[in-house]
A protein has these predicted regions:
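Short, acidic, metal-binding catalytic loop of nucleotide-sugar glycosyltransferases
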Residues: 1-6
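A conserved acidic beta->alpha catalytic loop
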Residues: 13-22, 42-43, 77
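Conserved donor NDP-sugar-binding/catalytic core segment of glycosyltransferases
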Residues: 43, 78-115
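Short beta-strand-to-loop acidic/aromatic patch adjacent to the donor-nucleotide binding site
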Residues: 66-78
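Catalytic donor/gating beta->alpha subdomain of glycosyltransferases that bind UDP-sugars
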Residues: 142-210
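Non-catalytic, C-terminal membrane-associated alpha-helical segments of glycosyltransferases
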Residues: 187-282
Length: 283
């Protein structure tokens, strides 16, 4: 239903056992830009690393240099018709934008009301990561671990690119499986997010503030508490952390500025400071 159709849409079927393969085959017959790639069923669902492994299974079979933009895109989304048209227009207007997205909402099961997933404006959302191809290559792609969808945006800023998302009618979409609603429940999903923050190198002070913020939004208290415990549990167990020390240092400095100045002011100031890096390498 998009006003701008893709040149190529690679769909990776990584082991569907329902009617998905037949549905995909029917769509591929109708739309010549759809390419279906089947991947062997792993026997279990692996959130985080598994998601990115599936993405690269398709990505590695495409010559991305032939395309200006690349998008990691989940199928459980209901997008407004002008979604990709608007994103491309924004990127054309500002060549420093490396990755962008709209905002995710989900429907309340009781009254059908749309509820925001509360993604910050300084991030593009994980379920629809729209990238300028040159930027995606510059950051080295996605890390194959939980929190890949946060690390990539920080890497963009480190290299002088801008990561951003907008909450506007043409860019608001419905996420049919909300953030943290893992196959094992909300608590497990939010704990996994807490581990992801730990892995990325987020400090305890920032994580605590972030968890308190999440406690004030659905699912009230439980979501934020689960995130905090997932982080602290990983810290106590001394689980492995992200090995890019320079990027972790960059992230920590930025997060402290967010606590001191507020996220909007801190992000604007950082993007201004990083402008020369982008000009030297990509202008």
């Amino acid at each position: 239903n998009q006003t701008v159709q893709p040149d190529l849409w690679v769909i990776v079927d990584d082991g569907s056992t329902d009617e998905t393969p037949q549905i995909l085959a029917d769509y591929a017959e109708q739309y010549p830009f759809i390419k279906i790639i089947t991947r062997e069923n792993r026997g279990h669902r692996s959130v985080g690393p598994g998601v990115i492994e599936a993405f690269y299974y398709g990505y590695d079979q495409v010559d991305v240099s032939q395309f200006d933009y690349v998008c990691k895109f989940d199928l459980d989304l209901d997008l407004p018709p002008k979604y990709f048209e608007v994103l491309i227009e924004r990127m054309q207007q500002n060549p420093r934008i490396g990755t962008c997205s709209g905002k995710a909402y989900f429907r309340d099961k009781k009254n059908g009301e749309l509820i925001s997933e509360k993604c910050g404006d300084e991030m593009s959302v994980g379920m629809t990561k729209f990238y300028r191809s040159i930027c995606f290559e510059a950051i080295g792609g996605f890390v194959r671990q939980v929190m890949w969808d946060g690390i990539d945006c920080h890497k963009c800023r480190q290299l002088g690119w801008i990561a951003v998302s907008w909450d506007e009618p043409d860019l608001r979409f419905i996420h049919l499986r909300p953030m943290g609603s893992s196959q094992q429940g909300i608590f497990t999903g939010r704990m996994r997010h807490g581990f992801g923050q730990y892995f990325m190198g987020t400090g305890l002070t920032y994580m605590t503030a972030s968890s308190v913020f999440r406690m004030l939004h659905p699912p009230y208290f439980l979501g934020g508490a689960a995130m905090w415990w997932g982080y602290v549990k990983s810290l106590l167990q001394r689980k492995p952390r992200f090995e890019d020390k320079e990027l972790v240092k960059f992230i920590n400095k930025y997060q402290w500025q967010c606590l001191l100045k507020g996220k909007t002011k801190a992000t604007d100031a950082l993007n201004a400071r990083q402008a020369n890096i982008w000009k030297q390498n990509y202008a």
